[in-house]
């Protein structure tokens, strides 16, 4: 029996795939547990429509990420932070991705999850630092952060 998978089933198929499976397995497990539905003309049309909508949403997400990357590439886009430091320019404490994300939201009204910032170590010194931000699977941008004496 041909079925359209509604979700990933380990060892059998991924969501949206159309595969031939044994009749008993399809009726007694896949269809009963709503993991698949029979591959009829109506169901195939619905799957194609869903796939098209998902592709469109993914393309819009990628375009939005590229637009944000261009905004970050602008030299005027700098996240300003302040901190106390010693005489040698080293901070007392550090600037973390959480603080950078909060300052970015406060200054530019752009909300980015702190886990998307790929900062290997917190910032311990005054001055400018480029922080890589993974906006999408295919898009990584550099965000300029300026830490000054506060």
From Swiss-Prot:
Signal sequence extent: none
InterPro entries cross-referenced by the UniProt entry: Ribosomal_bL9, Ribosomal_bL9/RNase_H1_N, Ribosomal_bL9_bac/chp, Ribosomal_bL9_C, Ribosomal_bL9_C_sf, Ribosomal_bL9_N, Ribosomal_bL9_N_sf
Species assigned in the record: Leuconostoc mesenteroides subsp. mesenteroides (strain ATCC 8293 / DSM 20343 / BCRC 11652 / CCM 1803 / JCM 6124 / NCDO 523 / NBRC 100496 / NCIMB 8023 / NCTC 12954 / NRRL B-1118 / 37Y)
UniProt-recorded name of the protein: Large ribosomal subunit protein bL9
One protein family per Pfam: Ribosomal_L9_N
Family, similarity comment: Belongs to the bacterial ribosomal protein bL9 family.
PANTHER family (alphabetical): 50S RIBOSOMAL PROTEIN L9
Domain of life: Bacteria
Molecular functions per Gene Ontology: rRNA binding; structural constituent of ribosome
UniProt KW keywords: Ribonucleoprotein, Ribosomal protein, RNA-binding, rRNA-binding
GO biological process: translation
CC terms in the record's Gene Ontology section: ribonucleoprotein complex; ribosome
Biological function: Binds to the 23S rRNA.
Disulfide bridge partners, by residue number: none
Gene: rplI
């Amino acid at each position: 029996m041909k079925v359209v998978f509604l979700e990933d089933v380990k060892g059998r198929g991924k969501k949206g795939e159309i595969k031939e499976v044994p009749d008993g397995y399809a009726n007694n497990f896949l269809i009963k547990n709503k993991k698949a539905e029979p591959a009829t003309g109506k169901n195939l049309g619905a799957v194609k429509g869903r796939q098209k909508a998902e592709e469109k949403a993914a393309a819009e997400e990628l375009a939005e990420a590229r637009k944000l990357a261009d905004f970050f590439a602008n030299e005027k886009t700098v996240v300003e932070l302040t901190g106390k430091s010693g005489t040698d320019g080293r901070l007392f404490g550090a600037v973390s991705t959480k603080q950078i994300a909060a300052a970015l939201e406060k200054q530019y009204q752009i909300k980015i999850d702190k886990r998307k910032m790929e900062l290997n170590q917190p910032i311990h010194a005054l001055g400018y630092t480029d922080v890589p931000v993974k906006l999408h699977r295919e898009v990584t941008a550099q965000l300029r952060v300026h830490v000054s004496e506060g």
